[in-house]
């Protein structure tokens, strides 16, 4: 299905052109995770289905793709949480990467009562749009593997990154941020799990590299001064750290307590995907469990730091500020 989803929501949104925000307008979506494969950028999102006073109701993950950042193809659901037979509920944040000719999908779910709490699942497919199947038959990471946390949702929001030497790393967490290597089979942790929690870390880590610098971007919450999450980041010359806090990259998402970043370089331009709660569909307004994915240009300073990102309605329909 080929779409620019403008006509299916409030009139104020319907007047915006291709590339404007939000990207997806016929469904509530959250936790964007881009992946570039050839001349196409794929975007994986969680499907927010909360009704009225529900907090979160997320049962499936969706995929979209584009070749120009303005027109998007809807590939439909790629997995349901029930596809992980050991999982109980909650199709939370995910990321997909390509390695060795296959597509590996990592996602946070609620484990059944054999391992209570949140867990990280891994699935695999021969195609970026699926079908994906459980690659392990059990969780990659469970709450019992990170005993420092004081809450059952510590092990969420995986980000996966393959370094130049071919080693794949996974980072994740809520309140604490953890990192570990993956074995070449992509379904087992290789070595120790280490904590790398940067300043004000709340959740939603995202790893990427530009030049020789590694970036850890994440949802931050300074409880002394803020009520809603913002995006902050840290940098390092090695994934082993030390990580240097670089400050806030964005403000909070409009009408949303949560925010979640995904970053990609596509056709020589950098982009940051986010979510807010500014979309209305029919008689349902945006809310904590009804969010909308957006995209903005991402620019860098000469020293490698990222320029602050303003969240806009125009999105990438407008050129980046440096051009």
Segments (PLM) and residue ranges:
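Bacterial N-terminal signal peptides
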Residues: 1-10
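Carbohydrate-active catalytic/glycan-binding domains of CAZyme proteins
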Residues: 13-323
């Amino acid at each position: 299905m080929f779409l620019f989803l403008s006509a299916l929501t409030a009139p104020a949104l319907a007047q915006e052109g291709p590339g404007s925000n939000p990207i997806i307008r016929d469904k509530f979506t959250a936790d964007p995770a881009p992946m570039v494969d050839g001349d196409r950028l794929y975007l994986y999102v969680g499907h927010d289905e909360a009704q009225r006073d529900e907090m979160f109701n997320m049962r499936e993950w969706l995929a979209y793709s584009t070749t120009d950042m303005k027109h998007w193809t809807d590939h439909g659901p790629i997995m349901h949480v029930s596809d992980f037979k050991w999982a109980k509920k909650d199709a939370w944040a995910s990321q997909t990467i390509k390695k060795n000719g296959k597509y590996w999908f990592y996602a946070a779910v609620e484990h059944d009562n054999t391992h209570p709490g949140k867990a990280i699942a891994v699935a695999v497919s021969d195609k970026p749009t699926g079908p994906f199947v459980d690659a392990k038959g059990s969780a990659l990471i469970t709450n019992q593997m990170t005993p420092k946390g004081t809450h059952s949702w510590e092990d969420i929001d995986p980000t996966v990154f393959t370094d130049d030497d071919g080693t794949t790393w996974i980072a994740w967490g809520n309140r604490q941020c953890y990192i570990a290597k993956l074995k070449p089979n992509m379904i087992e942790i290789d070595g120790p799990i280490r904590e790398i929690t940067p300043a004000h870390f709340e959740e939603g880590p995202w790893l990427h590299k530009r030049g020789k610098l590694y970036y850890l971007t994440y949802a931050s919450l300074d409880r002394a001064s803020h009520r809603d999450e913002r995006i902050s980041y840290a940098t390092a010359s090695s994934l082993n750290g030390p990580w240097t806090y670089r400050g806030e990259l964005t403000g909070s998402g409009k009408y949303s307590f949560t925010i979640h970043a995904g970053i990609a370089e596509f056709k020589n331009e950098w982009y940051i995907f986010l979510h807010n709660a500014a979309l209305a569909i029919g008689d349902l307004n945006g809310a904590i469990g009804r969010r909308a994915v957006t995209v903005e240009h991402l620019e860098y300073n000469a020293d490698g730091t990222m320029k602050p990102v303003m969240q806009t309605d125009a999105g990438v329909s407008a050129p980046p500020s440096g051009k």
